[in-house]
Amino acid sequence: MKFHVIVGRGATASKTALLLAEDGERVRMISRTGGGPDHRLVERVAADATDTDRLTELAEGADTLFTTAVPPYHAWPEQLPILSASLLTAVRRTGAAYVMLGNIYGYGPVDGPITPHFPLTATGPKGRARARAWEEAAASGVKVTEVRAGQFYGAGAFSVFSLLVQRPVLEGRLVLVPQELDVPHSYSAIDDTARTLVAASREEQAYGRAWHAPTATLSVRELARRLAELSGAPVPRLEEMTERDLTLLGITDPLWGEMHEVLTKPGHPLVLDFSETEKILGVGATPVDDVLRQLI
């Protein structure tokens, strides 16, 4: 029986664990709280993944080590390198294949559709931290691949849309959004991202490069309108937050202050090309309405 380790306990980690377990493969999930889904083939362990010796012990014998874990948003520049170094060391010691969940911050502002072959040219601290994690893993000689997702949406998502947009839309309230309302963005569903992680882990030609999770590309206004129509809520009222709004909110909550780097790129659509994922890994995007219906 194949054995995999997943570092993380969020929606993507849990869905990935269930996909593997439902195929009869054993999974050990590692997180500080020991969370994860209830399944006979899923073992949940409370441990700190930055404790490299403990992580190595828990990953011994694993065919694959998946990571979906990230530090608190405002602490990425300081803590993500520590976590990434621990994960990479554990992979080196155990010989497990390494599958990373990433995002698009490492690309920086890009014009036109982004392929996974684009250089990682971000200059901001969070973007550089993300890029460095992949660059160091790719240069290490281990068997590694990365799946980069857009902004998450749908059931289980933790994102700007899920935190700030979906509930006010469903309740018919004014929606304050810290990004441009009519600029296209690529959104990834949790299930599609998990399916891509599993598919990449099983495909030999997936290693040594990055892939894009399937996405739906539309503006936040369009996505909010679709959700309202499906749920029977009123036409959404959206208002774009200014940089000054974010600065003031950041005084009391560091999360808001951190959004400047990744959300205020005027006129820059964030559009991911995932055609290679469809063609080679065989994973496509779930229709937008099907993803949104999970929220109703």
Q: PLM ranges: what are they?
A:
Residues 216, 220, 224-271:
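Terminal hydrophobic/aromatic helix or amphipathic segment near a protein terminus
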Residues 167-188, 204-205:
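A conserved pocket-lining segment of Rossmann-fold NAD(P)-dependent short-chain dehydrogenase/reductase
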Residues 131, 154-165, 200-211, 233:
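Glycine/proline-rich active-site loop of Rossmann-fold NAD(P)-dependent oxidoreductases
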Residues 35-94, 201:
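NAD(P)H-binding glycine-rich loop region in Rossmannoid oxidoreductase-like domains
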Residues 276-278, 282-296:
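Amphipathic terminal alpha-helices
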Residues 103, 135-156:
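Conserved beta-loop-beta element that borders a ligand/cofactor-binding pocket
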Residues 85-130, 145:
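Conserved Rossmann-fold NAD(P)-dependent oxidoreductase catalytic core, especially the SDR/UDP-sugar
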Residues 13-14:
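N-terminal Rossmann-fold NAD(P) dinucleotide-binding loop
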